[in-house]
Amino acid sequence: MASVAEQLASNISFSAFKNATELKKRIWFTLLALLVYRLGTYLPLPGINIDTLRQIFEQNQSGIIGIFNMFAGGAVGRMAILSLGIMPYITSSIIIQLVVPVVPKLNYLKKEGGEQGRRQINQYTRYGTVFLATIQAWGIAVGLEGASGVVIDPGLFFKVSAVITLVGGTIFLMWLGEQITSRGLGNGISLLIFAGIIAELPAALFGTLQLGRQGALSGALIIGLVFLVIIILTFVVFMERAQRRLIVQYPKRQVGNKMFGGDNSHLPLKLNTAGVIPPIFASSLLLMPITIANFSTGEGQGWLNTVTAMLGRGQTLYMLLYAGLIVFFCYFYTAIVFNPSDTADNLKKQGGFIPGIRPGEKTAEYIDFILSRLTVVGATYLVLVCLLPEFLISRYAVPFYFGGTSILIIVNVAMDTMTQFQGYLFAHQYEGLLKKS
């Protein structure tokens, strides 16, 4: 049986789009913002020898630095002013969300502060972003100077200017993402990552086809990879839309001589409640300690290069850490975005109940029981999708990063943006009805 949202979406007339002025403005703003972002990934950092940098990057792009480059939309390979990308913001968000439950002041702001509390927490996230971006930018500047011939005029001036430029680029992307969210279409931060991945796919595909022409990859292997990508995309779409629906009943009420209520509804629980957040968080934590390793060839960097090698694509340590972090963040983020006790209290206030389950605490325990088991399935699904391509890439040496994380981001962002697009279109089509309600 179709959900209410699906029934409403089926009634949307896309012919109404030509009259949806507000929606058109949001789409144009989003496209313009993404264009500005892409232009920024081609503006090189001042004082860099691009040719030497390109040679070093081509020798090391098969490692985890390739993942970093993917999230930055190719800016790392060009050492552009937006090379840090939005990853410091994501890392800061992880840290803030981890400390909110254990810091009484932050926990109070989240639960009781309302809109003002949410803004205050967001401000702390921005401060953390600037702090982390400064550390990472300084590390990159030092690493670039350690690589022979990359920096034209090494020294303190280069380090300071590089830090200011890279941190400014991250702040700009953070602001741009917020503007897309408020004035555009979709979630701004997610769309920036999405745009970076999509922009790099044509070059990656072209490189793979070139290897096929040169005989480095067999035609059968390339065809098999195409079918594998299609199968994974289909599987991801199915799993992202999968949900467990708990039946909710409402008792009948007699008002005068008429009976009201008695309707049945359902409480949808997504199979993957955490969405694409766990793989992104896991990737950002694995990237954070080694953002400069592949650019540094100076003395004293042996241990850092060893860590980088152990965290390379297909390495056992990398895959174990990646899987463990994905599972952890699945449970952690699910606990943040869905509170069984609050849901049970809301059902009780509305007079609803799950058949066979007492309202209140027992309902919360039952919902938590179901949600925990759904999270097991969801976490297993995310681990399989993220690690299977990694294993195949390391096994068959496919020369570009097209892992499960990128597939998950593409599918989730596309679905979320389309859902928001349908919501705006529906609101425009039934504007009069919405005003009355």
Predicted regions and their residues:
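N-terminal cationic and glycine-rich segments that engage phosphates or anionic surfaces
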Residues: A2-S437
